[in-house]
Design a protein with these regions (language model features):
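Extended intrinsically disordered terminal tails
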Residues: 1-245
Length: 245
């Protein structure tokens, strides 16, 4: 049976579903943003790390070759000896700087001193897998949200035969309980209390998607119009009952 309380309850239940999906999507997008920011740091730093490792490898190889050459070089090749000594000293200095930079980079990401590029790749792969999982969830909840919005619009269309003010007031009366129930469902699903700021954002998004501001304005106008009518009727009645005035 289509009655004002039944329609009000149906609309508020659908509104609660919209609110839940808005919150979950906001939570997912926040997680995605966090991972994307991390990846934007990790990926270039992995390139930097592999670059440092490559430079250390090349300079170590060059130093080793020059040390061997110097060892084999006859003493009377004074000029070459000096050139080799200068170059070896430069390479030692370069290697110290590169190793120090590499150590600081590992420290920044809380890796062990002997960690290799594999550690970076492993963490990047974990983040990318997490991002993919969140993207799948985002798609799922976006579809669910669209479905709830369609159902809401269909039920709203059926409610046109009822007094909009009466329906609005019936909905407002049960909304606090429905919203509390939504928060409980979110807490059960996410194993944590909903974040207040995110929850407020989800409520604003729900209101926007359901066009609640326009609906509220319309109801206020109807109430104001009704009051004016009542006021006019009351004046007209008084005039009829007191013809001398």
């Amino acid at each position: 049976v289509r009655t004002v309380p039944a329609i009000a309850e149906g609309l508020e239940k659908l509104r609660s579903r919209v609110l839940i999906f808005c919150y979950q999507l906001s939570h997912i997008r926040s997680g995605k943003s966090h991972i994307q920011k991390s990846l934007s740091v990790w990926k270039p730093e992995l390139e930097r790390y592999t670059g440092l490792v490559q430079q250390i490898k090349e300079k170590s190889k060059e130093r080793k070759a020059l040390v061997a050459e110097k060892k084999e070089l006859p003493i009377y090749h004074v000029k070459r000896h000096k050139a080799l000594t200068v170059r070896i000293a430069e390479l030692i200095e370069d290697l110290e700087e590169l190793r120090s930079e590499k150590a600081l980079l590992l420290q920044k990401f809380e890796y062990a001193e002997d960690a290799g590029a594999e550690e970076f790749r492993k963490d990047i792969a974990t983040m990318e897998a997490g991002l993919k999982k969140l993207e799948t969830q985002e798609q799922k909840y976006s579809t669910e949200l669209d479905k709830a919005l369609t159902e809401y619009a269909e039920l709203k269309a059926q409610a046109t035969e009822f007094d909009p003010v009466e329906l609005y007031e019936a909905r407002r009366a049960i909304r606090p309980v429905q919203e509390k129930e939504s928060e409980k469902q979110l807490e059960d699903a996410m194993h944590e209390k909903p974040f207040l700021i995110m929850l407020l954002g989800a409520k604003q998004e729900t209101s926007r998607l359901l066009g609640e501001d326009a609906e509220e304005r319309q109801v206020r106008q109807l109430i104001a119009h009704k009051r004016q009518e009542q006021h006019r009727n009351s004046i007209s009645k008084r005039k009829r009952s007191d013809p001398e005035r």
